[in-house]
Amino acid sequence: MIEFQKGSASSKIKKFLNQVHEEYEQSNGISDKYFEYSITISSENEIVGVLSGYTVFSEVYVENIVIHRNYREKGYGKKLLKFLEDKFENEGYNNINLSTSEFQAPTFYEKCGYKLEFVRKNKINPKLTKYFFVKFFDNPNQYMGVS
């Protein structure tokens, strides 16, 4: 029997996934060190932006950067990325990964020093062409992901 579920995985499924992943990783001398994070930036006690993501193995992933429309192009996105980079730079991670669509912010990430790794073109709707970026830490002391 095969089942499809929409939405978050049940606790039973999460437990199974964690157990199998952990066993496999340990057999290969790897540890995922997975955790989710969020960073908020405020002005006058109001949240104006959020950067959220997760870490796994030796990498930091950015899932969302959202700035309220009234605060865009005022440097808040750059401040969030800089805070993220400073937070993880000396914590044993190798790099930060993020992706964005054509209609979002590919040039913003390039201006922030992120290198384009590849582009996945959407031939039906070019606005949904996906850009994948990375920024490597210069710190050679990478120890995350090793058990």
Regions found by a protein language model. Give the residues of each.
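Conserved acetyl-CoA pyrophosphate-binding loop and the N-cap/start of the following alpha-helix
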Residues: 71, 75-83
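Conserved N-terminal entry element of GNAT/NAT acetyltransferase domains
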Residues: 1-10, 138-147
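Conserved active-site tyrosine of GNAT-family acetyltransferases
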Residues: 17, 109-110, 114
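Conserved catalytic-core motifs of GNAT/GCN5-like acyltransferases
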Residues: 97-99, 115-132
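Acetyl-CoA-dependent GNAT
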Residues: 3-63, 103, 120
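Hydrophobic adenine-recognition pocket in adenosine-nucleotide-binding enzymes
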Residues: 65-67
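Conserved GNAT acetyl-CoA-binding A-motif
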Residues: 88-102
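A conserved beta-turn-beta hairpin within the catalytic core of GNAT-like acetyltransferases
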Residues: 55-63, 72, 125-129
